[in-house]
Amino acid sequence: MKVRPSVKPMCEHCKVIKRHGRVMVICPANPKHKQRQG
């Protein structure tokens, strides 16, 4: 899980979602692409 000021999809499988008021990227194909804003 990377914590970044700006989260962007890194591949076509990445999905931008919002959980508990935080913007997150989840990626089923490449778990390295997981990101959280903060």
UniProtKB/Swiss-Prot annotation:
Source taxonomy lineage?
Bacteria, Bacillati, Bacillota, Bacilli, Lactobacillales
UniProt keyword annotation of Ribonucleoprotein present:
yes
| Kinase recorded as keyword | no
Q: Name one GO biological process term.
A: translation
Which family does the entry's similarity section mention?
Belongs to the bacterial ribosomal protein bL36 family.
NCBIfam families the record matches: rpmJ_bact (TIGR01022)
Q: Which InterPro entries match?
A: Ribosomal_bL36, Ribosomal_bL36_sp
Q: Which GO terms describe its molecular function?
A: structural constituent of ribosome
Top-rank lineage group of the source organism: Bacteria
Q: Which UniProt keywords apply?
A: Ribonucleoprotein, Ribosomal protein
What Gene Ontology cellular-component terms does the record carry? Answer: cytoplasm; ribonucleoprotein complex; ribosome
**Under what name is this protein listed?**
Large ribosomal subunit protein bL36
Read off the PANTHER family from this record: 50S RIBOSOMAL PROTEIN L36, CHLOROPLASTIC, LARGE RIBOSOMAL SUBUNIT PROTEIN BL36C
